[in-house]
Every structure is written in structure tokens, then in C-alpha cells.
Amino acid sequence: MSLASQDYQDLAEFRFQLRQFLHFSEMEAREHSLEPQQHQALLAIKGLPAGTKPTIGELAHRLFLRHHSVVELTDRLEGAGFIRRKQGKDDRRQILIYLTPRGAARLRSLSVAHREELAVKGPELVRALQSVIRASRRSHAA
């Protein structure tokens, strides 16, 4: 499969739009006195699908981090009062992670800011993604 110059431009624009949002997210986290990974962890905990337990292993999976890195991350979050750990009811060896009221409030503030940014910048991101998808479909149909 060959790619035209426009294909590279479309991919580059999509990558730029993604990176622009990620940059906003990183800066916004820092303005709220969190490191970007801490913000991502709070969001991952709060946003887990129903029925998914908030374990270190699940967080490692969702954050693309190693187990020991998530342990260190949760240690820092717990020390700052953003999360609490609780022993599992069914499996006493299992440690579950929950947001504290302080963590939930910080995440809520950040999430509002992210939604506002996406309301403004989201259409550009969607357009860039749609350009890549359309080109991919055209090349697969040919």
C-alpha cells in the first residue's frame, strides 16, 4: 500500500491535534497541583467500567505502567490525600483504590476544564481523525 503526500499530512495533522490536547491536559493538571500521571490515575479510577475493580493491576493496565510504578503513583496520591486503599471484601489479599472527597473534587475541576477545552478544540480533532479514516477506507476499497 502506498501513501500519498496528503495521507502523511492527514496523519501529521491528527497527531498534532492529539498532542495539542495532551499538552493542554498536562498543563491543566499542573495548574491544579497534580502531575499528569496523577490526573490520569484519578480519572482511570473514577472512570472504570461498571463491575471493574479499582486494583493496582487494573490501573497498571489502563495507564500502560508497570505494577511497581503504579504502587509508587498510588503511594504519592494517598500521601496527598487524593485516594484511599481498602482491603477487598471477597479477596482479603486484594487492595482496592478509591478517590477521597478531596481527590473527587480535584478530578471534577479538571474534568470540567477538559470538557470545556474539548467543546472548543474537539471539532478540529474530529475533523483530523475523519480525514485519516476516509483516506484509509478509500485505500482499502481500491
List the model feature ranges, each with a label.
Residues 23-66:
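N-terminal helix-turn-helix DNA-binding core of bacterial DNA-binding proteins
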Residues 75-133:
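Charged, amphipathic alpha-helical coiled-coil/dimerization segments
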Residues 56, 74-75:
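Short, hydrophobic-biased segments on the C-terminal half of alpha helices
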Residues 8-11, 35, 56, 115, ...:
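Short, structured helix-loop boundary elements
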